[in-house]
């Protein structure tokens, strides 16, 4: 085989223009940015695996069991899957509305020093809120796709019956795009959703004045700033913590 057959000379600018967007879209869709159901693929795979394991109303099982079963949908290593699972638990306190009822040491999102225990020591099951996330999944409400090796199906989205994407904080950094969605009080969120469905001109700030955070704290903002954030989806504010000693 000649040398010319092994190499193709192409301008680097042409390659970047051709391949950057497909690569960016692959990262955005496949792992980095939460979908409209409020979940990244890694979250969805764990929760759906637990649902199929009948952990919605059943007894807790070892976290190691869930991690192992999740590998059928997610070919990442056990440590990556377990770290993702930890954040979804009540024990870690990272979410305003935890999806996983946990038993054991899952660390704390507010502590850099308090590490979570190994998955062989901790136990998990789906929290009651997941009843509203999975209630109609067997009624042809969402599309399913084959997993990475074509041996089973998994949902593209979860049919949550409330605006879950705003119920918990969700951060994602992709290629050329990033998102950082704060969480909101669930009662206010549901009231605002109902009001908006009844009247699209509803002033959401009157019902849902600002985000709510699982770590608590005092928000520093003005109403006009929050109005701009609600309208554009872009903006920032300060969250002040309190230290008791």
What are these model-predicted stretches?
Residues 1-233:
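Catalytic phosphate-handling regions of large nucleic-acid enzymes and associated NTPases
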Residues 238, 243-245:
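Protein-protein interaction/assembly regions in multi-subunit complexes
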